[in-house]
C-alpha cells in the first residue's frame, strides 16, 4: 500500500503474477461540498411563490384589497398621463417629469400586482423561470428609474423655487428630455447587470420563493453556489440608487424650505409647506421601505418583514403618487375642469 497525495494506492497481486494499482482518493471538505452541490443542482424550470400569507382565510380579503389598490393605481396614473397630454398649458418640463413618474408607477405596479392577484385565487402559485427572470428585470428597471425620477423632480422643484429667473435656462426642454433619458438608461443598465449575474447562479432542488413576487434577495437565498458577486452588486447599486437620490432630494428640499421661510404671506407659506410635506412623505415611504429591504444586513433581515416593506414601494406608493402630486396643484385642477367641461359639451 502506497500513500500518494490525498489518496491511498493499493498494490494487488493476482495469481498470474500481474500487479494491479487500485487508488482511492479522499475529498477535502470543500470538494465534498462542491460535489454534493453539483449532484443536487438541477435546471430550474419553475418557482413556487409563497405569497404574502399562507392563511387561506385571508386570501380573498387580500385579493379584494389589492385589486382595489391596483384599479386606483391604473386610473390615477393613466389619468394623469392623459390629462397632461391633452392640456397644452401643462406641456412644460415640470409636468413632463410628472407624466414620466406616472408612467413608471403604472409599469412598476403592473409588473407585480396582476400576478399577485392571480396567486391569491389559485392553489399553486407557480411561476416559470423565464417569467420570473422577466418580472425581476422589469421590476428592477422601473424601481431604479423611480428612484432617480423622484430625485430629478426634487431638483426641478429646487430650481423653480430657488432660481425662478433661471428656470427656463437650467431646465429647458432639452435638459428635461436628457434627464428623463438618463433616468431610464440607469434603470436599464443596473437591471441588466443584476440579471447578467443571475445567470451564473446555480439553484438546488429547493424552488420555493418566500415572497409574493420574484424579488432579487429572495431568489438568491435559493442558490447552492456562491452569491458573493450578486450581493456585492446589490450593495453597490443600492448605495447608488437609494442613497444618492435620497441625498439629492434631501438637499433640494432643505433649500426649498429655506426659500419658503422667506415668504412674507402666511397663507402662501402654509400652502407651500403643505405641498412640500406631502411630497416628502411619499418620498420617505418609498426610499425608507426600499432601504429597509436592500441596505439591511442579511444576518438580521427577515423575509416576512421584507415582504411587508416591499408592499409600500411596489404597490402603495405607485397608488399615492398621482394623488399627492396633483391634490394641491391648481394647474392640474384647471386642466381637469377644462377636459371634463369639453366632454360634457360634446
Curated annotation (Swiss-Prot):
Gene3D superfamilies: Rhodopsin 7-helix transmembrane proteins (1.20.1070.10)
Single annotated GO MF: olfactory receptor activity
The keyword Transmembrane helix belongs to this UniProt entry's keyword annotation: yes
Glycosylated residues (UniProt): 16, 40
Residues in compartment: Cytoplasmic: 82-89, 156-174, 253-272, 328-346
Keywords: Cell membrane, Disulfide bond, G-protein coupled receptor, Glycoprotein, Membrane, Olfaction, Receptor, Sensory transduction, Transducer, Transmembrane, Transmembrane helix
Localization per Swiss-Prot or TrEMBL: Cell membrane
Extracellular compartment segments: 1-60, 111-134, 196-232, 294-306
Topological relation to the membrane, as annotated: Multi-pass membrane protein
Cellular component, GO annotation: plasma membrane
Classification via PROSITE patterns: G_PROTEIN_RECEP_F1_2
Protein task: Odorant receptor.
Family affiliation: Belongs to the G-protein coupled receptor 1 family.
Name of the molecule in the record: Olfactory receptor 8G5
Classification of source organism: Eukaryota, Metazoa, Chordata, Craniata, Vertebrata
